[in-house]
Structure formats: C-alpha cells, structure tokens
Amino acid sequence: HLAPSGILYPRYAIFSRQAAFETGGNLRMPLFVKPLRSDASLGIGGKSLVHDAVALMERVTFIRKELNDSALAEEFIDGREFYVGVLGNSQPKALPPVEVDFTGFPEGAPKVLDSKAKWDERSKEFKGTKSVLATLPDELRARLQKVAVDAYRALRVRDYGRVDLRLTDTGDIYVLEVNASCYLERSSEFAMSATAAGIEYPKLIERIVELALERYKR
C-alpha cells in the first residue's frame, strides 16, 4: 500500500513458520531481523542486526522456535530516527516530530531501540537513549510530517497513530513502521508531541475518543 503512494520503506523478506519465503526485492546486508507480529521490541536484541546468511538463518530460527512467530528481515536503514504522531480521519494532521537521541548509546552498537533500550533501566542502552522534541529546519519538519500523513492515509489508519521514520545522510525519508495503536501513556512520545502542539494530555485522550465517535455517527 505504501509503494503506489511513492513512500520509501526498507526492502524486506518474510520467513514464515511454515518455511515459506516471501521477498520485496533483492536484499542487501546488513539486515534487521525481528518478529513479524510482536510489539514493544519483543525479540529485538544485539543479534537482530545480521551481516551474512548464516546469522540471518540463526536469527530466523530463534524467532520461529523461541517466539513462535514468523520473521521479518528488512534492509537496515541507518540514520536519524523520528516518531511523528498523527491525529484525524478524513483530514489527518501531523504532530511535531520527536527524535530518538542516541548520543549516550554504547560505542559501536547499532542505533536501534531494542528491548534493553526500552525496558531495562539498568542497561547502557536504556540510559544512553532518550526521546526529545526534534529541532529541525521548517522544510525538513514539513517533509517528515508529510511522509507521516501520506503513510497514515495509505494504510487507512483511523483516529490516531504514530509513524516511525529514518532520515538517511542523503536526505531520504524511510517509513520503518506505522503503529495504529501506539503507546499512549502520559509519558509517551505521542503525548509529548501533542503537548508541543498545544494539546494537553486530557484533551488528547478526549480528542481521540471524539474522532472514534464521529466515525460511528456517519
């Protein structure tokens, strides 16, 4: 659904539990390998970034056996990572982008938010990353927001969602994920973006409920 809209995303292959193989193109290493259906970085760790076929099959086997899931292998897109929240249905609006700051990440480690970086408060990965409101030129901010809204529309997301993006050194913007049910705690990146747009947390939740109700009234 993204390709017809001119939206960039990593080329990929799917390794199902039944050993079938699907591909979105000829893949180039390194690849980022993760469970197809899980969330919250479950199954993502230090061995998720693979550089050869042997490591790829080891990771696929781990996901199949230990997590009982199919594996998704994507070409790794290096660059700055942004989260762009989107609100709305017929006229979705993008919120201010949030950037993942990897400044304190362990040296040499791939810039990926794995399970340690998200949940293990004692880890170097957790301590070395933080989400901050992105400081960007107006033109770049507008580009990120446009890609987010285009992806949101293309996948027919409703009410609210978050689009995860990577900006390469050459200025290309790739969609890594479109999360139609993203984390909504008061401390979440989505809430941070909404606050920056002048929408306080109670109003944000109220607006999401209103958007859902409007759909059912039509």
Residue ranges of each PLM-predicted region?
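Active-site nucleotide/adenylate-binding loops and adjacent lid/helix of ATP-dependent enzymes
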Residues: 1-72, 78-80, 91
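ATP-dependent carboxylate activation and anion-phosphoryl transfer catalytic cores
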Residues: 3-7, 135-218
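Residue-level structural signal for beta-strand termini and adjacent loop
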Residues: 15, 98-100, 179
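Short secondary-structure boundary/hinge segments and terminal tails
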Residues: 19-21, 81-82, 170, 212
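Short connector loops/turns at beta-strand edges and beta->alpha or beta->beta junctions
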Residues: 36-38, 120, 181-183
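Short small-residue beta-strand/loop micro-motif enriched in glycine and branched aliphatics
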Residues: 40-43, 127-128, 185-190
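Phosphate-binding site of ATP-dependent enzymes
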Residues: 53-146, 167-174
